[in-house]
Amino acid sequence: AGFAGDDAPRAVFPSIVGRPRHTGVMVGMGQKDAYVGDEAQSKRGILTLKYPIEHGIVSNWDDMEKIWHHTFYNELRVAPEEHPVLLTEAPLNPKANREKMTQIMFETFNTPAMYVAIQAVLSLYASGRTTGIVMDSGDGVSHTVPIYEGYALPHAILRLDLAGRDLTDHLMKILTERGYSFTTTAEREIVRDVKEKLSYIALDYEQELDTSKTSSSVEKSYELPDGQVITIGAERFRCPEVLFQPSMIGMEAAGIHETTYNSIMKCDVDIRKDLYGNIVLSGGTTMFNGIADRMSKEITALAPSSMKIKVVAPPERKYSVWIGGSILASLSTFQQ
């Protein structure tokens, strides 16, 4: 969250609401009935954490309202009734959800004006394009969204229910095979950090696996909050490999490369060349080292042999949806 015209968000925090597991444990601490974002994160040991956004779509509106309240009053420190608001939504977000979002903004927060933009379209704007295909992968969902001259093509949007949270879960599982045990919601957050700091995508998975068996070159160590040090090797690239091989976690779905290709194939034959040449990655789950090269290699193998393939992974892609929103909302034509 932040202000139009800024080049980066003022506030970045997870969409988590935490409630105390046992009431009255912290006597005299002025205990709240709910904690949001980083505070929920830091007190996770005594809380039960809930994620009101599932697969990119809001499923718990009471908790979502708490998150928005926290955003306006605690993070941005603004009166919502004094500022027009730009919200973003997942592609193919149900119309009822958009209406509910609008209702809460006008009725609960009294915003003077609001607009809801599709996330992937904003990412494309942020990359300086108006035509291309965006592969956006966050915590709960991934989408491939072909966009032509600023408009998303809804018939060709594909959704893949595989994203950051699944990778974290998979890493928890394969670390267990190594003899490390991570099970609680609090421990999941530790594993997420391991994933973000140490994982990478192999250009050639099988070859990387062979290398890791004979050499310790891929091994890295990580210090847990309690001071214990764990060693992680092949898990580093086995974890995000799931993006290209969902069958590894028992999912019958196409990987992100094939989903992108399928999305392009659903578009008019005349615009495919423009899409192949402008494949834009966005979202936190595209932050792995090696992802652009691997994506390029895999799509080149699927596409017609003469086709020019270009995969763009902008350095700011973790926040490119927000940056695109900042650009859009600061245009005078848009404000009118």
Curated annotation (Swiss-Prot):
Catalytic activity reads:
ATP + H2O = ADP + phosphate + H(+)
Q: List the disulfide bonds.
A: none
Q: What class of enzyme is it?
A: hydrolase
The UniProt keywords, alphabetically, are: ATP-binding, Cytoplasm, Cytoskeleton, Hydrolase, Nucleotide-binding
Per UniProt, subcellular location reads as:
Cytoplasm, Cytoskeleton
Where the protein is mainly located, per its record? cytoplasm
**Which segments does the entry list as coiled coil?**
none
Q: What is its EC number?
A: 3.6.4.-
UniProt xrefs under SUPFAM superfamilies: Actin-like ATPase domain (SSF53067)
List the InterPro entries hit by this protein, alphabetically: Actin, Actin/actin-like_CS, Actin_CS, ATPase_NBD
One GO cellular component assignment for this chain's record is:
actin cytoskeleton
**Which Gene Ontology molecular-function terms are recorded?**
ATP binding; hydrolase activity
Q: Which PROSITE patterns match?
A: ACTINS_1 (PS00406), ACTINS_ACT_LIKE (PS01132)
Which PANTHER family does the UniProt record give? Answer: ACTIN
- Additional note from the record: There are at least 13 actin genes in potato.
Q: Which family does it belong to?
A: Belongs to the actin family.
Q: What does this protein do?
A: Actins are highly conserved proteins that are involved in various types of cell motility and are ubiquitously expressed in all eukaryotic cells. Essential component of cell cytoskeleton; plays an important role in cytoplasmic streaming, cell shape determination, cell division, organelle movement and extension growth.
Name it: Actin-82
